[in-house]
Each structure stands twice: as structure tokens, then as C-alpha cells.
Amino acid sequence: MGSYMNKTSVVKVGNVLIGGDNPVVVQSMTDTYTADVEKTVRQILALHKAGSEIVRITVNDESAAAAVPEIVKELAKHDCHVPLVGDFHYNGHTLLSKYPECAKALAKYRINPGNVGFGKKKDTQFAEIIKIAIANDKPVRIGVNWGSLDQALLARLIDENNAQENPLSLQQIMYKALITSALESAKYAEELGLAKDKIIISCKVSEVQDLIAVYQKLAKECDYALHLGLTEAGMGTKGIVASAVSLGILLQQGIGNTIRVSLTPAPNAPRTEEVRVCREILQNLGMRTFTPSVTSCPGCGRTTSSFFRELTSKVKDHLDEKMHTWKEQYHGVEAMKVAVMGCVVNGPGESKNADIGISLPGSGESPVAPVFIDGKKAHTLRGDNISEEFIEIVENYVKNRYGKK
């Protein structure tokens, strides 16, 4: 961990603890029309099953607000009690006041200081939401976005900057505006009576270097629990890499208590992809373990056969499918390391270093595949059923090592 690591307040969101010494929490957000209860429930269940520990939903109109209690009831029928966060912009004060059951059903409210109200109405409407949060004992995320920054605050800071002998750059003013908006709003919430351990803050931008710079400054200036994420990461590889780089750097420095990866899904792609990326970031940083890791080689001229790629895919899919039940039956199985290697160069070594590994024959090598368990050669596989036999060996290893003694 880096020198920025700060001890933050601990915030309870439903049954999930964020901040302090607690593990970094994975969040996600639905993209359904919230008033469509059936579709929204289906997507929340999918996100939660994929590993999302908190799910945010849009509450943008009266139909959505009225649907929230029903969504929570339907989720409970599936034994799903994942905390739901209501995402409010512009009219949150009205919706929470008019639909008190919605206010009770949500586990947290998200407020954007840039659009909670304008002019003289801003403080009044912000205060209305905070008072409702206090009355219902709910935490609040004060989420600032560069794309919807409080323009009055920005104008004020620009005027103050212009009067300085050595004015800041426009980029520095941007950073200052984001942080000032979040911290002034949090301070006002505390003045209204909301406890510090009910406040999470975020300052989101869409560029990697900007996000890193803003959160490094923010972490030095406060001890609120911090929500990390690019406000718009983008689609596909670009979005995944941008999120992994920015969040990875900050998390390694000890900055951030909960994360969301805001991917633009490809057409027909599952919404759960953003959850998978969050979990991969945390697991590859060594901060959390969710599912057994699979080490596999990229392939080269020695591995002319595509079989090792097919076996790697089968093993990974099998582990992902099984983890839903394994995590309840076999304590610690999520930390298991599996290796699927394609030739003799690194195959035996990587397989020995894993809990269980297989070294497949490369081009011109003897058509046998040694299997290593806990560093020792345990089996030699050959023939047309290597995939099935290796997966069976993995299954037996899990039962023997992680089963109740």
C-alpha cells in the first residue's frame, strides 16, 4: 500500500460495511426502467449472483419511486437481500417526500450536488433529502460528477482564482471544484445532523489521470468513506483497461472503499460484465478472493495445438459455474490456484507452483500430460479424455482439501 492510505469512517449500507478496515465492496447499477418491476428484479438478481454486493437503481420519477418497495419484496421472495441504492437527480427531495415507503425500502440515497437544486432552492432541497435520510437512518452518497458540476460553485472558484497573483490552471480548478463541491456538501449534511458514518463521497471524472489526481487530493483532505469509479469508462477493452488502471493505482495506494466499473455494454452483452471486472481488479491486486484463479500461457510456436486454450476455457467456465455452490460447501476454495500450461518450457514449473496444475504437450513433445497436486506429480493423462479427467481431478481435489473434516 502507498503513503496515501487513510483510515476512513465505516458506513453501514444495509448489511454491508464500507470503509475502515473492511474489504473493498463491489457495486453495480441496473439499466432497466425501474418501474418495470419484473425486469428490474431479474437484473438485480443477475448482478447479485455475479457478485455485486450493492446495487444502484435509477429513481427518476413517481413510477420508479412507487416501484421500489415492490422490487424489495420480490427480491426477498428469491432470498435476495442485496442493499439497493436510489440514484436521485433533480427531484429526489420530491420523490422521497411523496413516497415514504420508497425512502424506507432503499438502503442508501445517492445525491448529486450539481443538480439537487439550483439557486436559492439548492440548500433547501438538499436539506430535505438529508432530513429524510436522518429520519429513516439511511446513509447518503454525495456523488459529484464533472459533467454535472455545480456551475455556481465553479464560477465562484474561477473568480477567486482570477484574483490570485499566481492563479491555478483550468485543470487544477476542475480538481478543486470537484473536491470542494463534495466536501462542502458533506459538511453541510453534518451540520444538518447526518453523522459522518452515514456519508460516502465520490468525485467522478471520465479520464484516468484526472481521476487519480482528484482522489489523491481528496484522500488527503478527508476521512469519509470513498466510492471509486470513472463516471463513464467506455465500451469493451478501452473501458476495462481504463477502469483497471485508474482504480488499480488508487486502490494500491490505499484509496477507495467501494468501487463500480461504469462500462458501456456491447449490444446484447450481459450487464454483469461490470461486476466481473470489479472482482478481477480486486482479486488481481490481492485485496479479495472471489473465485479460484487459473494461470495459463498465451501460446507460442511450441503450442501449435489449440487444445490447451480449449481446456483453459473449460476449466475456467467449470470453476465459475461451481463457485455458486462451492462457496457454501468448501471454505477457502476461492483462494485455490489452478494452472493450465501448453508446453514443457514453463508448464511443469507453473503447475508445481499452483495448487493443482496440468502441463500439456507442446509441438513435438511426448503426447502425455502430467498433473501436479500441491507441488508433486500425481497423475499422467493421455488420450482423448484429458479435459474430462482433469476436471474430475480438480473436483476431487476440492472435496478432499476444502471439504469439512
Swiss-Prot record:
- Cofactor: record remark: Binds 1 [4Fe-4S] cluster.
Pfam families xrefs: GcpE
- Reactions performed catalytically: (2E)-4-hydroxy-3-methylbut-2-enyl diphosphate + oxidized [flavodoxin] + H2O + 2 H(+) = 2-C-methyl-D-erythritol 2,4-cyclic diphosphate + reduced [flavodoxin]
A GO term (biological process) for this protein? isopentenyl diphosphate biosynthetic process, methylerythritol 4-phosphate pathway
What pathway annotation does it carry?
Isoprenoid biosynthesis; isopentenyl diphosphate biosynthesis via DXP pathway; isopentenyl diphosphate from 1-deoxy-D-xylulose 5-phosphate: step 5/6
* Signal peptide segment: none
The residues listed in the UniProt record as binding [4Fe-4S] cluster, with positions renumbered to this chain, are C297, C300, C343, E350
Which key words are in the record? 4Fe-4S, Iron, Iron-sulfur, Isoprene biosynthesis, Metal-binding, Oxidoreductase
What does this chain do? Converts 2C-methyl-D-erythritol 2,4-cyclodiphosphate (ME-2,4cPP) into 1-hydroxy-2-methyl-2-(E)-butenyl 4-diphosphate.
Please give the name of this protein: 4-hydroxy-3-methylbut-2-en-1-yl diphosphate synthase (flavodoxin)
Organism, as annotated: Francisella tularensis subsp. mediasiatica (strain FSC147)
What taxonomic lineage is listed for the species of origin? Bacteria, Pseudomonadati, Pseudomonadota, Gammaproteobacteria, Thiotrichales
This protein's encoding gene: ispG
